[in-house]
């Protein structure tokens, strides 16, 4: 069938690239579609960021990640994944957002829009969704959240020197941002609705933040929720019911992110109403939609602390092993021509 790919991967992050590598190794015709740039989520990380994990755990395709540090930097990771894509000659279409995934006659029709909102369609026998979770922040849903002074993504600290900055959240992203802002001369207030910092904060970061809070270098408001955001101040409420008005120039609402469950449901994937975990065979990672596979953090639902690059990078082997087996069965049954090796 002309123009039909054996495998179409949605997402060119590390997990999507790992899936593409395995498909290419299996001799399957492949297309990867990415809404942004290569490893788009990693590109949006703060420029000076260092990963929490070792370089070996970021490696895919048996290619080593060279780094002068035990934990690689953002710049080193971006260079590495460019080399991966080039080494394996992965066919990637950038700036194409997948809008629909349908299989009306057993062949998937994938509808996309390019950077200029022009529609186009691709067809594939199997689809792998590896879209991650970094695109959709967990919103506060409060007045003023849409003000220009509010961001759900931390960038870098210099612009906030001698400014009053609120960091909302109590996990790794909030901890790193609060410390970085303070070290670059910002007046930082950390606001967290829980009574203490998250236990998931990395062991070398948490004591640093706790000490800065203890010495009052960083103001911390625990068991506190932001109720309103205004141009020059924010309104917060303590667990006791006390309402405070905190002077403020900028807000980083680092309250986590979630996968695009609506996109999955639009593709026919069943999503649990409580855990938001999509229906997925744990052995093959095939969803309830035949031929539609899920890879990476999206299979964990709301529990985004369960899967990271270091374990999601192995999903491609599981998925392509199942696809290859089914392709061979179809070839033997005479229902599919053998893939061109």
What is the predicted role of each segment?
Residues 5, 12-90, 175-204, 272-274:
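Beta1-alpha1 glycine-rich phosphate/pyrophosphate-binding loop at the start
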Residues 2-5, 9-35, 153-198, 283-331:
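Rossmann-like dinucleotide/flavin-binding elements
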């Amino acid at each position: 069938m002309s123009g039909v790919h054996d495998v179409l991967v949605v997402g060119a992050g590390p997990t999507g690239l790992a899936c593409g590598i395995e498909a290419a190794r299996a001799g399957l015709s492949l297309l990867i579609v990415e809404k942004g740039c290569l490893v788009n989520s990693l590109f949006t990380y703060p420029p000076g960021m260092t990963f929490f994990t070792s370089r070996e755990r970021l490696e895919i395709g048996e290619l080593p990640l060279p780094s002068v540090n035990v934990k690689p930097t953002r710049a080193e990771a971006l260079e590495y994944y460019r080399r991966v894509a080039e080494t394996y000659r992965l066919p990637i279409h950038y700036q194409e957002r997948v809008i629909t995934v349908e299989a009306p006659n057993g062949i998937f029709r994938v509808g996309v829009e390019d950077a200029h909102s022009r529609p186009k369609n691709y067809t594939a026998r199997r689809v792998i969704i590896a879209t991650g979770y970094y695109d959709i922040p967990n919103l506060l849903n409060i007045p003023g959240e849409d003000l220009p002074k509010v961001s759900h993504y931390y960038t870098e600290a210099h612009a906030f020197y001698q400014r009053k900055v609120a960091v909302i959240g109590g996990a790794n992203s909030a901890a790193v941002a609060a410390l970085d802002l303070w070290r670059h001369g910002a007046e930082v207030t950390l606001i967290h609705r829980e009574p203490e910092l998250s236990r998931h904060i990395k062991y070398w970061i948490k004591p640093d933040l706790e000490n800065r809070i203890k010495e009052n270098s960083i103001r911390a408001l625990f068991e506190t929720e932001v109720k309103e955001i205004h141009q020059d101040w924010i309104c917060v409420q303590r667990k006791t019911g006390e309402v405070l008005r905190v002077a403020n120039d900028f807000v980083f609402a680092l309250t986590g992110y979630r996968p695009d469950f609506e996109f999955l449901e639009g593709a026919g994937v069943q999503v649990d109403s409580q855990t938001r975990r999509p229906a997925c065979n744990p052995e093959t990672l095939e969803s309830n939609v035949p031929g539609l596979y899920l890879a990476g953090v999206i299979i964990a639902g709301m529990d985004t602390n369960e899967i990271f690059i270091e374990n999601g990078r192995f999903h491609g082997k599981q998925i392509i092993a199942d696809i290859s087996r089914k392709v061979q069965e179809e070839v033997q049954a005479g229902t599919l021509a053998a893939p061109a090796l």
